[in-house]
Curated annotation (Swiss-Prot):
Is able to cleave peptidoglycan. Belongs to the transglycosylase family. IsaA subfamily. This is Probable transglycosylase IsaA. The keyword Hydrolase applies. Residues 106-127, 136-146 have a biased composition (Polar residues). Residues 1-23 form the signal peptide. Keywords: Glycosidase, Hydrolase, Secreted, Signal. It comes from Staphylococcus saprophyticus subsp. saprophyticus (strain ATCC 15305 / DSM 20229 / NCIMB 8711 / NCTC 7292 / S-41). It is an enzyme of class 3 (hydrolase). It comes from the Bacteria. GO terms for molecular function: hydrolase activity, acting on glycosyl bonds.
Length: 243
């Protein structure tokens, strides 16, 4: 798209479009041809796209007429064509300032070639193909959900089995003199048998939910048992609420 600024404030519209056609050097004035002046004037006023799309007919022509106070001009050399309309007499009024590109723009010249039309069509096709993109995004979401599920499954395997809890409770009973059933109740109540359980608010960790602001994190089950025995020997059953 190329825009050309004209100085005249009376020009209303101007379109120029490139087009390949069979050359015909015969030219005719509007008065010499049987053309529908009213129809051409209506196209210029209300449907300029049709005039930009193709010439009036093949070959060279030159139609110029005045209708309704406007002067209309339609020309073609057989390869390119142009059309415009202005208030009658506007050209002579602005001939002295036609080169003044600083004047207020009132007319735009539009130039379109066949290559540009094809380029625009190709661009439209590309935009349609791009609609397929959301499918890839949907698949990605599904894969993410599957990954999340797998992670949760892995986390649940850290829960200590019932037989292991019984064995831990029996060892704690032997080392402290407190019954295995009581130690089993503490383990199930405090951590549900999860040796890696962490209380987000207090920082308590492991099977016995030992307090220590994180220093117990990563301890083995045996280390947790040793620490629990130490806490019991120092603080007694009161170290665990609702013994």
């Amino acid at each position: 798209m190329k825009k050309t600024i004209l100085a005249s404030s009376l020009a209303v519209a101007l379109g120029v479009t490139g087009y390949a056609a069979t050359a015909d050097h015969n030219q005719a004035h509007a008065s010499e041809e049987n053309i529908d002046q009213a129809h051409l004037a209506d196209l210029a006023q209300n449907n300029p796209e049709q005039l930009n799309e193709k010439p009036l007919h093949a070959g060279a022509y030159n139609y110029d007429f005045v209708l309704g106070g406007n002067e209309y001009t339609f020309t073609s050399d057989g390869q390119t064509w142009s059309w415009n309309y202005t208030t009658a007499g506007a050209q002579s009024a602005s001939s002295n300032t036609i080169q003044d590109v600083t004047a207020q723009a009132t007319t735009h010249t539009n130039e379109t070639s066949a290559n540009e039309v094809r380029t625009q069509q190709q661009s439209s096709n590309t935009e349609v193909a791009a609609v397929e993109a959301p499918k890839a995004s949907s698949n990605t979401n599904v894969q993410t959900a599957q990954t999340s599920t797998s992670t949760k499954s892995t986390t649940t395997t850290t829960t200590t089995s019932t037989s292991s809890i019984d064995a831990i409770a029996n060892q704690m009973a032997e080392r402290t003199g407190v019954s295995a059933s009581q130690w089993k109740g503490v383990i199930q109540r405090e951590s549900g048998g999860n040796a890696n359980a962490v209380n987000a608010s207090s920082g308590a960790y492991g099977l016995f939910q030992l307090l220590g602001h994180g220093e117990h994190a990563g301890m083995s089950v045996q280390d947790q048992m040793d620490k629990a025995v130490e806490v019991y020997n120092n603080q007694g059953a009161g170290a665990w609420v609702a013994w």
